[in-house]
Amino acid sequence: MNVSKYVAIFSFVFIQLISVGKVFANADEWMTTFRENIAPTWQQPEHYDLYIPAITWHARFAYDKEKTDRYNERPWGVGFGLSRWDEKGNWHGLYAMAFKDSWNKWEPIAGYGWESTWRPLADENFHLGLGFTAGVTARDNWNYIPLPVLLPLASVGYGPVTFQMTYIPGTYNNGNVYFAWMRFQF
């Protein structure tokens, strides 16, 4: 592994830790959030979820063409989760998923997701979501070292079927990836 890759890994982890530190400025806030959001999702889930990865897209403006020509953008895999809707109508989920990454190698990810949910139409089944996910992933090209992730989430859904997505930021020829999956609630 070359020095620039170590710098990139360190920078990524450092930025993630700073972000988490700002969100949870003190332990009481963190424990309250855990107690009110994550623990009930684990202890009393309303739904069991099936995750099916759908697409990975590398932003063409941020990559050399010869790189994107080699990348896998069909991330087949599967995931499972537990979820619930809170009293405000917001979605909370705990999940674990494994999919084929850009290099066609397995990448596991597990974490917690939250989305503020809107139902803008008269049909209450249609919903839009915007939120975040916090979790841990590991990649082949980083020797499967567990890496924390804090990423945005967005979704559009109808009833128990949701198309959910995130964007992984990055630098030139690294990151800048749109990743989306289908989530089926049972």
Swiss-Prot record:
GO terms for cellular component: cell outer membrane. It catalyses: a lipid A + a 1,2-diacyl-sn-glycero-3-phosphocholine = a hepta-acyl lipid A + a 2-acyl-sn-glycero-3-phosphocholine; a lipid IVA + a 1,2-diacyl-sn-glycero-3-phosphocholine = a lipid IVB + a 2-acyl-sn-glycero-3-phosphocholine; a lipid IIA + a 1,2-diacyl-sn-glycero-3-phosphocholine = a lipid IIB + a 2-acyl-sn-glycero-3-phosphocholine. The record marks K67 as: Role in lipopolysaccharide recognition. It holds the Pfam family PagP. The keyword Acyltransferase applies. The record marks Y172 as: Role in the phospholipid gating. The keyword Ion transport does not apply. GO terms for molecular function: acyltransferase activity. SUPFAM superfamilies: OMPA-like (SSF56925). One of its GO terms (biological process) is lipid A biosynthetic process. The active site is at H58, D101, S102. Its EC number is 2.3.1.251. Keywords: Acyltransferase, Cell outer membrane, Membrane, Signal, Transferase. InterPro entries: LipidA_acyl_PagP, OMP/PagP_b-brl. Homodimer. NCBIfam families: PRK11045.1. This is Lipid A acyltransferase PagP. It comes from Shigella boydii serotype 4 (strain Sb227). The gene is pagP.
